[in-house]
Amino acid sequence: MCYSAIGEAAAKAAMSAFERVIWAVLDSVGIGALPDAADYGDAGRNTLGHVAESRPLALPNLVRLGLANIEPLAHLAPPARPAGAFGKAATHSPGKDTTTGHWEMAGVWLDRAFPVYPHGFPREVIAEFERQIGRKTLGNKPASGTEIIKELGDEHVRTGFPIVYTSGDSVFQIAAHEDIVSVAELYRMCEIARKLLDGPHRVGRVIARPFNGPSGAYARTPRRHDYAVDPPRPMLLDVLKDRGISVFGIGKIHDIYNGRGVGQYATTMSNADGMQKLHGALRERPSGLIFSNLVDFDMLYGHRKDIEGFARSLEEFDRLLGDFLQQLRDADLLMITADHGCDPDPRWKTTDHSREYVPILAYAPALPGGVNLGVRATLADMGQTVAENFGGRIPHGQSFLRELSGAAGQVALGEGQVRHL
């Protein structure tokens, strides 16, 4: 294609809406500490930066889109003109969890963080939960999910008492061996907990954590299920639903928004399964929003401080991304981002999420790329971009839809400042 044809295609795409937006959230793949990270005990944490320092990474597709143009990443050379637009965004809301991040992407700012329980849940909460499920519980403390089933798994198998635990995030997690407590019964317990945990104890998520295996080799199974709460205000998925725009959720998306605004959805067993379902959605869904969360980075590697596993998972995603990019049409927009960080660097002993910027990569085959989106003041800028594309608007955020053509230049945010990287 000649240069004039490229320019004509870019101008046309900038003037008309993309028929389809594919939004992929790489759960916990942050890109450096936010200015207020010290308030969360996260000064110096940098998920992508530290994984890149751990060894050379093979990420040719992410680098081609502009990942290494956002921040310097060890062993990764930024292209002079990446194929995509690139930037990073701050989380405006207090907190550093999945719900806060995804809600903000959709235009919901929280005034206060979801409650956390560094010393376990209040005795009255646990007592009422035990009364309603008809059995005692074990644990009730912050813990790594893999470590607590090592510690208490045998006692759970012997007694049948479910293991209740939390973390540095706003979660009430219930672990049970599938041979001792059926998955259906575990889900019922989670539904009871979700109804119980309201008011001042309204945690962001109740999570079912089934596991199996013999003593000494317990392992979590993929039948995890999240029970969230409704977003408190109208948000992107409501706007799209009202406008008749289809929303297809992949992975945890349905659970994170408590089903609000999500039409059809597909759960996933792994990142590879999530990418396979994204491929299927490209074949079957010609328009609307395809919204996915790929959780392995967080669940399998970030919380477990497995920096090598995190590196391999990024490389796996990059390999799968290469073929995916070939399937995109001129009327498609792909956005790749994260919801928070979860730095696996062993120098930080905590296994909790980290308060970090998230990367933004935006790619459309019809656009020239190479656009610096700068540092965005809120994750809601991405949601506002999607909303504007489909003719709507959400309460917060500044759209960068027009910037993607490279013709609009840098704009000032209504609720903060954008600066060049």
Question: What does each model-found stretch correspond to?
Answer:
Residues 2-421:
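Feature captures the catalytic ectodomains and active-site-proximal regions of enzymes
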